A protein has these predicted regions:
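A short glycine-threonine-serine/GTX helix/turn-capping micro-motif
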Residues: 19-21, 277-285, 393-395
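Short hydrophobic/aromatic beta-strand micro-patches
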Residues: 258, 345-349, 387
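Short, well-ordered beta-strand elements within core beta-sheets of diverse protein domains
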Residues: 19-23, 300, 342-349, 392-394
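N-terminal glycine-rich, Lys/His-bearing helix-loop that initiates the first secondary-structure elements
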Residues: 1-71, 204
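Short acidic (Asp/Glu) and glycine-rich catalytic loops that position anionic groups and cofactors
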Residues: 9-15, 42-46, 51, 183, ...
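PLP-dependent enzyme catalytic core of the Aspartate aminotransferase-like
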Residues: 74, 110, 314, 378-421
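Conserved PLP-enzyme active-site core in the AAT-like
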Residues: 64-67, 71-329, 388
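Conserved small-domain helix->loop->beta segment predominantly found in fold-type I
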Residues: 293, 298, 309-361, 366-382
Length: 421
């Protein structure tokens, strides 16, 4: 087992070009810390009213972990630019579930005698249009969404997309649907993401129309891009941000929740509910080893944020242009060099994605095949979804992505073996 694990490690870390956009490589420091002593410890804790809202730990030997959690919260608040963060969730999906559970509990806070009412209309990105599973009725939203009495299906309304660009939200049509359905929750965020989400425009609209909704942004794929090179969600009007910490962010595989509520705000009670739906609602042992590694990752991100993020956007746009120049069908808007994120998407023909992804893997290029918005599902996947974040961390620059694009075009279009190159 050790031999095979080391063999696999060397292959992925030293011999492959890793282009899966939901993956990254943590630093050696993050890996080391993630496997240190806290990895086998417990540190359950919560704020107790009888102890004047102080954090009370249920185990001894946790003073170091207490310090780590406080420092991590401080670093993540600085990174997000928000008032409160929860770092105990173990994944983006768990983060979303904690938020959905809290929203449902908050909705029913004045009626504890009757069966809890589920969330009314929720707006999100359709899964075939790039939406993430964790924001779908078939995923994390399943137990918290009401049934539409007209359709007898989950009360979800999907964002409409532009006719000439199915990867981009149609803002004006979205406003019409918001006005019609008056959703309780609006969830931005996608797993197949080429564009910024129109957070500021939708925030302005719901405020003007006095629609009492909560705006949430699931930033799992773009968490490491928060800032001036991409989006500042809280400045634009998001109330809640969730995400996983290992895609564009530098961390081990964990989750995080941030909110921008102040103690004097009515919705600060929702934040307190999010905390309680995290622990004890969602997790007992919150994996102290990777939480320690996450602190180092947060230090790294806050130190190198500007250089990393600018390189990501620059490399993604350059990679997309190069792929197009070598004859591949790059999707998206050419006016913005096809992407505003770390992702680049190439159409390879109906149902051809899996075979071409396997061909590339045989040549040590690792990609992710996906269905396009025009295809009926994953089995018909005709696209390759790629990200530049991991190879940017390994030091790739625009010239390297241009060389890679040329080799990939040879492999995809002409069937040439490129492994030796």
């Amino acid at each position: 087992l050790l031999h095979k694990a080391i063999e696999n490690h060397v292959w992925r870390q030293e011999q492959c070009v890793n282009l899966i956009p939901s993956e990254n490589t943590p630093s050696r420091a993050v890996r080391l810390l993630s496997g240190s002593d806290p990895a086998c410890r417990y540190a359950e804790h919560k704020k107790i009213l009888a102890f004047y809202e102080k954090e009370v730990f249920y185990y001894q030997g946790t003073k170091f972990i207490d310090q780590v959690e406080r420092m991590l919260a401080e670093e993540m608040r600085a990174y997000f630019g928000c008032t409160e963060v929860e770092t105990r969730t173990l994944s983006g999906q768990m983060s979303n579930m904690a938020v959905f559970s809290a929203l449902m509990d908050w909705k029913n806070r004045f009626d504890r005698k009757n069966e809890a009412k589920r969330l009314g209309y929720v707006m999100n990105n359709h899964i075939i249009k790039g939406g993430h599973l964790s924001a779908q009725p078939m995923g994390a939203l399943h137990d918290y969404i009401a049934v539409d009495p007209v359709t007898e299906k989950p009360a979800v309304v999907n964002f409409p997309v532009c006719r000439d660009n199915p990867y981009k939200m149609d803002v004006e049509e979205t406003k019409k649907l918001i006005d019609r359905y008056r959703p309780e929750l609006i969830i931005f965020g996608k797993s197949m993401v080429l564009h910024k989400e129109p957070v500021a425009q939708i925030r302005q609209f719901v405020d003007e129309q006095k629609i009492p909704t909560t705006i949430m942004y699931d930033m799992a794929h773009v968490l490491g891009l928060i800032g001036d090179h991409f989006q500042n969600p809280f400045q634009e009007g998001a109330e809640i941000v969730t995400g996983s910490t290992h895609k564009t962010f530098f961390g081990p595989q964990r989750g995080v929740i941030g909110v921008n509520y102040k103690e004097e705000d009515l919705k600060y009670g929702l934040w307190k509910t999010i905390e309680s739906r995290t622990f004890p609602g969602s997790v007992s042992n919150h994996h102290l080893g990777t939480q320690l590694g996450m602190l180092m990752a947060a230090y790294e991100m806050n130190q190198f944020r500007d250089a990393y993020q600018s390189a990501i956007i620059r490399n993604a746009k350059s990679f997309a242009r190069s792929l197009k120049s070598y004859g591949l069908d790059v999707v998206g808007d050419p006016a913005i060099d096809y992407t505003e994120t770390h992702q680049v998407i190439v159409s390879v023909g109906y149902g051809e994605g899996a075979e071409i992804a396997e061909r590339l893997e045989q040549n040590n290029v690792i990609v992710n095949y996906q269905a396009t918005p025009d295809e009926e599902g994953f089995t018909a996947s005709g696209a390759l979804r790629m990200g530049v974040s991991e190879m940017t961390r390994f030091g790739f620059e625009e010239k390297d992505f241009d060389q890679l694009a040329s080799l990939m075009a040879d492999c995809i279009l002409r069937g040439r073996e490129i492994k030796a190159d």
